[in-house]
Each structure stands twice: as structure tokens, then as C-alpha cells.
Amino acid sequence: MLSVISPAKTLDFETSPTTATYTQPQYLEQSAELIEILRDYSPQRLSELMGISDKLAGLNAARFAEWAPPFSPENAKPAVQAFQGDVYQGLDAAAFSEADNEVAQRRLRILSGLYGLLRPLDLIQPYRLEMGTKLANRAGKDLYAFWRERLTQDLSRAVEDSGTPVLVNLASNEYFKAIDAKRLTCRVITPVFKDEKNGQFKIVSFYAKKARGLMSAWMIKERIDTPDDLKGFDVAGYAFNAGLSEGDTWVFTRRESDVAGA
């Protein structure tokens, strides 16, 4: 059983990683192809393409200009510790043991607009390129056209190699659209996290994102490898809600009284 998550816009390349183990991304050749396209964009055009401020556009133009393999611990960082944000706050990969890192390499993947599909310890250099970006390339008009075929095949293989043919989709809709779900050769379970608010269970973005990371970490640390085990997720006050779940869209809910203590 394997889980897949989205990357994060916020990056941390200042803090040293808590593991000396690292691997190389498997799609560096394709990443380099995208970098060459992006280098032709001025900061102003990047701002328009990516919908970001002039300051951020300038920063990312510089990142694209400086991007250079080969990757090493001196110029790159393992993806799972470079990404920050709500999901990664919940994941807290810096607290993983080496045994946890080994499991994560087999059981967790990170979708990326620039790197395609990352294992947790794959080295990355700083970038910003969301999967929904309409960056024209040889394969089509956007990054979905560029990545979908190879990522679908690669993710299917990774799920098979994990031992249990089940994919736990903890990615955002924007990123999971990079996968042709109909062609996956496995069962796909999509957890949804809802918090009680004024007597009703609703998706609260910050809590839901953090919960995706919490579930990913729990699956790794507890060595979860069956769907039945997944229903036992009980971190931070969440519990499986059979009444709200439908098919393989599994809803986990949390009472308002449990939020403060989480």
C-alpha cells in the first residue's frame, strides 16, 4: 500500500536534513527539459504564467537560472524535508527514524510539477512550478500533458512494489489530475477529513491538509499495509466515519471538542 501527497510552495533549504541518506530523482532529464523552457521566460512572463507577484517571479527566474545537476547534499536537499507547509507540518519527516525513512521510500510518493514523482529522500533544488501551470511543451499545452503518461505508469509500478495493490490518495485534486486514475492497475482510496463546526462536519482547509500529512506519517510509522488497518486512523482526534463515507471515498471526522487538544 502506497500513499501519494502534493508538494508545497513553501521551501526550507536553510535547515540541515536529519538524515544523511539520499537518492536521486528519476526524472531529472525531463526536469531539465522543463527548466530550459522556463529559462526563456522573463520574470514578467513568469509572473503572468504562474499568477505570482513580481518579487516571487524574480526569485523563481533566479532559481531556474541556477538549477544545475548533478544534485548532491551540498546543493540540494531531500524532498520530504525541503517542502514545508500544512501537509508537511503534519508529516514531520524530520522526526523519522532511519527505519521510517526506509519504509517511506517504498510507501510514499510526492507529485511535483517540475520533478514528476519523487520519493521522500530524492534530492531537489529550490523551485516553484505548480502542476496546474499551463506551460506549453513538446507533449502539449500544459504539465498534465507532459507528465500524465509516465507518472501513471510509474505510480502503478510503485504501488505493485509496495506489496498491497492499494493507492491512498492524499494529494490535492490539482496534483492527482496528473494521474490517469482509470488506467491505474490498483484500488484507489481517497481519505477526506472533516471537522465539526456549528454541529456539522465540514472540510476546513488548514486542518484537512495537516491531516493528510498526519495520515501519511501514521501509515509509515505504524507500517499500515491493508485498507482495514487504514480505517483505524485515530491521530489528533480523527476517526473513520462509515456513515459519511461512500465507496472508496473514506471520510474521517473530528469533533469540535477534540480540535484544541490535537
Swiss-Prot record:
GO terms for biological process: response to hydroperoxide. One of its GO terms (cellular component) is cytosol. InterPro entries: YaaA. Coiled coil: none annotated. It comes from the Bacteria. Belongs to the UPF0246 family. HAMAP family: UPF0246 (MF_00652). This is UPF0246 protein Csal_3046. It comes from Chromohalobacter salexigens (strain ATCC BAA-138 / DSM 3043 / CIP 106854 / NCIMB 13768 / 1H11). The lineage of its organism: Bacteria, Pseudomonadati, Pseudomonadota, Gammaproteobacteria, Oceanospirillales.
